[in-house]
């Protein structure tokens, strides 16, 4: 009986510790390839933030997963404020070249402003 109780408590503690360590992010994105009717995987997306002089500074760069998603832009941490003007650049031309297709858009820029700490999702 003591072993079962100890095992149960150990599992509960471990579960709480692991869930407390799970990071959260303020920004995510998703790309659907409407020509194929499926997610666009392995597409590079760069995240820029505009400074007070109007210049764009790259702050992150990732590739979409097999579901066409990036879930982890702008990690939420205590005392971190992500307010500001941002730009996501979706590098679509290499994706279409890999599929032997022409692309009208070599890249797609999406500009947006974060004014609070809510989660935002930018799909294209």
Where are these regions (language model features)?
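Beta-strand-rich interaction surfaces with strong enrichment in secreted/lumenal proteins
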Residues: 59-63, 76-78, 98-99, 109-112
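Beta-strand-rich domain onsets/edges
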Residues: 7-40, 49, 56
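Short, acidic Ser/Thr/Gly-rich low-complexity loop/linker segments typical of extracellular
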Residues: 53-73
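Short Pro-Gly-centered beta-turn/loop motif in secreted/extracellular proteins
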Residues: 71-84
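Beta-strand signatures of extracellular beta-sandwich domains
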Residues: 44-48, 87-89
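Positively charged n-region of N-terminal signal peptides that target proteins for export
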Residues: 1-4
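Feature of secretome-associated and extracellular-like proteins
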Residues: 83-124
